[in-house]
A protein has these predicted regions:
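NAD(P)H-binding glycine-rich loop region in Rossmannoid oxidoreductase-like domains
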Residues: 4, 10, 16-67
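Conserved Rossmann-fold NAD(P)-dependent oxidoreductase catalytic core, especially the SDR/UDP-sugar
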Residues: 57-59, 69-111
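Conserved beta-loop-beta element that borders a ligand/cofactor-binding pocket
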Residues: 89-90, 122-145
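Glycine/proline-rich active-site loop of Rossmann-fold NAD(P)-dependent oxidoreductases
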Residues: 118, 130-132, 143-152, 187-197
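Alpha-helical substrate-binding/gating segment
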Residues: 125, 154-163, 170-204
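Mid/C-terminal beta-alpha module of Rossmann-like enzyme folds, strongest
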Residues: 190-237, 270, 276-279
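C-terminal amphipathic/interface module of NAD(P)-dependent oxidoreductases
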Residues: 240-279
Length: 279
């Protein structure tokens, strides 16, 4: 494992073999690749945390684009290379697309985040020239008990203050964390997964439906909408990812016969909430 804090990683992951790496600062320690057949590259500055100041946007771009470039450069220097590179991307690649069905071959948007995704994935795909199969995992809104989007949503909903964002018509390409892991492993093991793969549930919902379902799961009312201008005032440019409508669908995963553990939203939320000690 490579990360910013290898000591913490070893403690948290049971003594895993961990190495220090700052993604945007240069090559990786080559000893980390010894005997490895698959590389999972998941590192990067969090996109949905904090306002997108100039410094934040620079950190997002450099950690992903430069980090991936540094990774591929290190792979090029190896005498024996891994066979597969799986790189995390995000559904922000597609931008705000209304009710359009979004598959892996849909065109990118021209927003800041989409442009980062295009550059990020392009750097990853250069590993094909080194003989690696490359999968870029465009990940949606992750539902997990202790990470992803859900824990940040819960406090107002628990108080009965939850509500839809704007008019609630925007599509949310959600995914349970167990299926994120499952799809990353599926990408690593499946030769037919080559290029982009949407890491999303086969059943996206609108924000209105999501809000209602989460309220029902918590047995709380969820009727206080958050206006678009309020999100813009609170989060600035970053609010675009909260309001973007992305009806992304997992065509590649389904065509390669991935079996979703949580294809429906309510069981996914119940599974997360059952592990939440504060519920």
């Amino acid at each position: 494992m490579l990360g910013r804090d290898p000591i913490r990683a070893r403690a948290k992951l049971g003594g895993v073999n961990a190495f220090a790496w700052q993604p945007d600062t240069g090559p990786l320690p080559v000893e980390a690749f010894s005997g490895k057949e698959v590389i999972f590259h998941l590192a990067g500055e969090p996109v949905a945390e904090g306002r997108w100041t100039a410094a934040k946007k620079r950190a997002i771009r450099e950690s992903r684009v430069e980090g991936t470039r540094n990774l591929v450069s290190t792979l090029k220097s190896l005498e024996k290379r891994p066979a597969v590179l799986v790189v995390a991307s995000v559904v922000g690649f597609y931008g705000d697309r209304g009710d359009e069905d979004l598959f892996e071959d849909s065109a990118p948007a021209s927003t800041f985040l989409a442009e980062v995704c295009v550059a990020w994935e392009a750097e990853a795909l250069k590993a094909r020239d080194l003989g690696l199969r490359v999968a870029t995992a465009r990940t949606g809104i992750v539902m997990a008990p202790d990470g992803g989007a859900l824990p940040r949503m819960l406090p107002p909903f628990r108080l009965g203050l939850g509500g839809q964002l704007g008019n609630g018509r925007q599509w949310m390409p959600w995914i349970h964390v167990d299926d994120v892991v499952g799809l990353l492993l599926h990408a690593a093991r499946t030769e037919a997964v080559d290029g982009p793969m949407n890491v999303v549930s086969p059943n996206p919902v609108t924000n209105k439906v999501f809000t209602k379902t989460l309220g029902q799961a918590l047995r709380r009312p969820a009727v206080l909408p958050v206006p678009r201008f309020g999100l813009k005032a609170a989060f600035g440019e970053m609010s675009q990812i909260l309001m973007a409508s992305q009806r992304a669908l997992p065509k590649v995963a389904q065509n390669t016969r991935y079996n979703f553990r949580y294809p429906e939203l309510r069981p996914a939320l119940d599974a997360c909430l059952s592990k939440d000690p504060t519920r």
